[in-house]
């Protein structure tokens, strides 16, 4: 069985201290943001059994408030194709099962390549965890007005969309404020999930309902495994049966996730 590399947040948490997950594609500037937010207040170690770094830190916000920040390895999606991506996939899967999820997810995207970067963001939205989208590298855009911030916030249904530039060191205070506000509100995000045909949804429910606390994430996760011919924690025979049932309904399982 595949070994998981779950993150255990710092144990010395108080009612005024929360932990936040920093997630994003490789080379989106995520770690630079982590370093700017935490400064020297960070701890770097390795995930068990591998050389992938695990970075945790403490961020000091307004009013002497603090929150703990975890910088997850960069990944393009939750369908793991490397050790780094497997760590993120395992971690997110544990959150979907209700195992100590973060209070807020900060999804960092490259503002100059939204279409590619937002794929991971939309996958994470199915967790129903409050999310802040960070548009990094805004300094590289010839015309920053081409991104309609409020429209993007509304369409994604996230707590905030914050434009920043880690390279130019601007926008970090706005990001801290947005995180702090989300931690105070701890409100569920409202967003429109990917539509799934009812016939397919009924088949998927047979597989995923016992395993997840978030039905939206569970459906999306099961859909990925069915369409990609992947295993799911010993449920291979069930997946194959559901895949065959969907084929009998006249749907192509190879294109369900598209």
Predicted regions and their residues:
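Short hinge/gating elements
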Residues: 72-75, 161-163, 190-191, 251-254
